[in-house]
Amino acid sequence: MDKLEIAQYLLEQVGMPQKQHSTLCCLALLAMAKLTKETPCVQATNDWVRIHDIISFIGEHYGVIYAENSRETFRKQAMHAFRTAALIEDNGKATNSPNYRYRITTEFLRVIQNMNEADNVVCEENVCLVQFVSKH
């Protein structure tokens, strides 16, 4: 599986609505985890990021260019739903603050890092995924 398929698989497994299985949402999740096409899932991170950082990462590493004025689209289609599902959290600043940031929750980071990419097969036995789904 490639990284987009892995992201889509994770979003499906945690019960995200079909609308959040879109390319935009999958790329946003990968960018937040700082996963390029070559980076193993075990190296995923949960650093604080702005939507601008997400858009830049996607353009640089996946070749998909989004205009800066699409930040609100990312916020509405991905971030709100991800936050509601406890996949990500924000830093509590005002949304119009230049210091407003998002990051993947520690719990969901463990899910991503425990994805088995060996032999291009996603491991169905991701214990962290099972635990995450059972709590949310």
For every predicted segment, state its role.
Residues 1-48:
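Short alpha-helical segments that sit at the start of domains
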